[in-house]
Amino acid sequence: VRAARFALIALLTVAIACQSERDQSSATRVGHGAKPAQRIISLIPSATETIVALGAADRLVARTAFDVDSALAHLPSVGEGLTPSLELLTTLQPDLVVAWPDNASRSVITRLERFGARIYTPQVQTLADLRQATRELGDMLGLAESADSLVASIDGELQAVRAAAAGREQPSVFYVVWYDPPTTAGPGTYIDELLQIAGGRNVFGDAPGLWPQVSMEAVVRRQPDVVLISQTEDSPIDVTNLRSAVGWRELRAVKEGRVVQVEADLYNRPGPRVAEAARRLAALLHPSHAERR
């Protein structure tokens, strides 16, 4: 449950920061013209994946408890990204720290700044944000061309998924970020965008907020065609139990077996694997087309 709860808190953390600081470029807080970072600690798993995708895995000097790449397993863990070990962070002497843009991380950021580390706080809620953050990381690592290539590759793959799904029926989807209380992806989030790219329609695409909590009554009224529940290995949900759960049992998608558990580490991380997430979504939403390919 710890990893799944962390994923939700992380999404909400960035959402709040984005709402209050959307007009500020996160890159301005690290300064331009500095030497490429060589000793990096990323407290955000999606940013860590981006650093690896840019070819700079060898510059990472630590990982968090939620970094799943086996290539990083040998690195010391600083704990959870929102509450890392300050002692270990300072001991490792990073020249760049990628941190969560929230008030809870302020003490971490302040202390690291005293030691001369640059701090980068990306605010990624949309695919456009992801492109910007990828390019900003590329600039800080001296890998601008690699970043441009990565963005172009992701965009090309997403466009291929969109083209393949064009013209198909668009099932309505209830994407469950967190099960209890039900929390979903609102309009404008990258999940909302990926659902559209994959040929689906976010059943809460008109909800207020980026990651709103919703009532089961509201879900029942909207009767989504498909329910996708994100989960981690340590937070399994027995889908069969939904058939007797209050509210859930009233959904046709539950009664007719259109509930799918999806990997939170893939879908809830706005990083270089978003195209893979879109492809999997398209296969889930249009299984007959996937089988013919």
Predicted regions, residues:
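Bacterial N-terminal signal peptides
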Residues: A7-A15
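Bacterial signal peptide processing site
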Residues: C18-R22
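Extracytoplasmic substrate-binding proteins
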Residues: D23-Q24, H32-R39, L96, R106-T183, ...
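A short, structured surface patch at a secondary-structure boundary
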Residues: R39-V108, V203, T240, W248
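Short secondary-structure boundary segments
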Residues: I44, P101-D102, V177, A207, ...
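His/Asp/Glu-enriched short active-site or ligand-binding loop at hydrolase and phosphoryl-transfer sites
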Residues: T64, P187-W211, Q231
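Proline-aspartate-enriched helix->loop->beta-strand connector
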Residues: T83-D102, A117, S215-T232
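A ligand-binding cleft/hinge motif common to bilobed small-molecule-binding domains
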Residues: N103-R114, V226-R243
